[in-house]
């Protein structure tokens, strides 16, 4: 049994398989998930697990060089946005309109659905390299 890092076997496998610039999404419970993208549904009830809880575990186990968020989060969900900025201060940030964000999710290797129920609590993580 694994002791540290991501314990969810599906998430651990996706992270291990990522190549440079591949993307994964951590999403609130309302983001539409394209049929063509692997869905890892962690939502057990409204608010659980939270977006920030899942984000923290993933960023501790993933090399990230860039993140993409919807512009709307900066004004409509400042609390989550400030936490994203703090936790990912080393990454480059890309801001797109929410509709474009949804289009970009079609290229992700997986979308991790949380129980988060606040607006625009979604992020695309772009894999970096560990060397």
Curated annotation (Swiss-Prot):
PANTHER family membership: D-RIBOSE PYRANASE
GO molecular function: D-ribose pyranase activity; intramolecular lyase activity; monosaccharide binding
Pfam families: RbsD_FucU
Main location class: cytoplasm
Name by which UniProt lists this protein: D-ribose pyranase
Transmembrane portions of the chain: none
Catalytic activity line of the entry: beta-D-ribopyranose = beta-D-ribofuranose
Function: Catalyzes the interconversion of beta-pyran and beta-furan forms of D-ribose.
Subunit structure: Homodecamer.
Organism: Bacillus cytotoxicus (strain DSM 22905 / CIP 110041 / 391-98 / NVH 391-98)
GO CC annotation: cytosol
Pathway assigned in UniProt: Carbohydrate metabolism; D-ribose degradation; D-ribose 5-phosphate from beta-D-ribopyranose: step 1/2
């Amino acid at each position: 049994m694994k002791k540290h890092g991501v314990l969810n076997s599906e998430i651990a496998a996706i992270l291990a398989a990522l190549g440079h610039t591949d993307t994964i999404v951590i999403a609130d419970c309302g983001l539409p998930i394209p049929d063509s993208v692997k869905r890892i549904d962690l939502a057990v009830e409204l608010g659980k697990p939270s977006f920030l809880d899942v984000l923290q575990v993933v960023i501790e186990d993933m090399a990230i060089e860039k993140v993409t968020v919807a512009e709307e989060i900066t004004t409509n969900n400042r609390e989550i946005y400030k936490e994203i900025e703090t936790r990912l201060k080393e990454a480059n940030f890309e801001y797109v309109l929410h509709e474009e964000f949804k289009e970009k999710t079609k290229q992700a290797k997986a979308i991790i659905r949380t129980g988060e129920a606040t607006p625009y609590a979604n992020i695309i993580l772009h894999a970096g390299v560990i060397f």
